[in-house]
Amino acid sequence: MSEPEVTYSTVRLHKSSGLQKLVRHEETQGPREVGNRKCSAPWQLIVKALGILCFLLLVTVAVLAVKIFQYNQHKQEINETLNHHHNCSNMQRAFNLKEEMLTNKSIDCRPSNETLEYIKREQDRWDSKTKTVLDSSRDTGRGVKYWFCYSTKCYYFIMNKTTWSGCKANCQHYSVPILKIEDEDELKFLQRHVIPENYWIGLSYDKKKKEWAWIDNGPSKLDMKIRKMNFKSRGCVFLSKARIEDIDCNIPYYCICGKKLDKFPD
């Protein structure tokens, strides 16, 4: 009997493509992870270094900002000081200029002051001479008690009591009109110097014009004051040391005549 024939075969198992990829991935993954672990250490150092640099930069920027702020403040203080000094200098120059102008003005006014003093001396001399001349003729026997002059005007006081019309006639007898008071200064002057009596003056009520009028029908700086007195249109006005007032023209009072001088005595 013959021996059976034995046949040998080699069985080869082929890995599937998915399994091959998995094996290959595992084979390659191992070395990469090792490489990553080796490379991560230098990067961490770099990141830390960059963080430190950023921190230093922030600190530097903060310090610079503080320095710039302090510099600006210091600069502003210096500018304010300079401006204050400049303003003080301007004020000092202006003060010096005004002082110089006042000095020059006072120098310029000296001739005017000297002129005014001269005029006053001459006026006083003229007043004294005029009063002396007129006083020497005061006793005329016609009722003139006294007279005197002030500035460019002479005043005649007739001390015979009469009506306003009689006063006007007596003044005309001396070729001097009944007194017209030019302004409030003259009024105050007369009230200081007259004897305490009542005196007719040249102001009466014009019934035709229905207004108060002076003897020459001219204006006076006293008109406004008279209008404020609200006279009652009773006829005529008299003067006393205390007031001027309207009253019946037929009441007898003393009389004041007044005239401006045309020529100064030498």
UniProtKB/Swiss-Prot annotation:
Q: What is the effect of changing F189S?
A: In strain: NZB
Please give the residues the UniProt entry marks as glycosylated.
N79, N87, N104, N113, N160
Q: Could you tell me the membrane topology recorded for this protein?
A: Single-pass type II membrane protein
Query: In UniProt terms, what is the effect of altering P196S?
Result: Greatly reduces MHC class I peptide tetramer binding
Outcome of S151G?
In strain: C57BL/6, C57BL/6 X BALB/c and NZB
Question: Outcome of T115L?
Answer: In strain: C57BL/6, C57BL/6 X BALB/c and NZB; requires 2 nucleotide substitutions
Q: Which InterPro entries match?
A: C-type_lectin-like, C-type_lectin-like/link_sf, CTDL_fold, Ly49_N, Mouse_KLRs, NKR-like_CTLD
| MF (Gene Ontology) | carbohydrate binding
Q: Where in the cell is it found?
A: Membrane
Give the function comment from the record: Receptor on natural killer (NK) cells for class I MHC.
Oligomer and partners: Homodimer; disulfide-linked.
* Stated name of the protein: Killer cell lectin-like receptor 3
Please name the taxonomic classification of the source. Eukaryota, Metazoa, Chordata, Craniata, Vertebrata
